[in-house]
Amino acid sequence: TRHGGCSQGNYASLNCTPYTGDEAEAVRRNQEIVCSSLPQRPQELVIPFQTHGTKALVIDGTYLHATAEERHSMLQGIDALITREPGCCICISTADCIPILLYDRKNAVIAAVHAGWRGTVNYILGHTLDKMRARYGTEGKEVIACIGPGISLSAFEVGDEVYEAFRKNGFQMDYISEWKPATHKY
């Protein structure tokens, strides 16, 4: 939920995403509210500009020592963040899309993944795990995944183009889709 913040109108009230068109000062104050409510105050709050793609960014010394302008550029088109930097709070924004958190318990690496249908059909989770493996030696058996809430099957309808994109990429359609005769959609 987004209650208890400073934003007005469409962004009411606890919007923390700076890429929405909300007032910058309201976003800053909302971020302050969130950070001050956490058990341990983060040193960094990292929020990417998501594009429903599959790109993952590792938040490490390169990012942390970059200028504000460089950081802004690095966060463009990113739908997953990975880090093992202490005090670094990685964030994603979702509405209908699915938030997924990953934790590599052996290497103390975390990831936050924004999984919309476009990212899912193009294996964003696999790309994120591959990047964790390449960078930190993450093994799947050591990863704990937490899948957050998103839109339900009954509320999310798609046309043939989305169905076909998943089918062509090898997804088991009997398990993830349902034909709705009344609307002629899945």
Language-model segments: which ranges?
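Active-site microenvironment for binding and transforming phosphate-containing groups
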Residues: 1-186
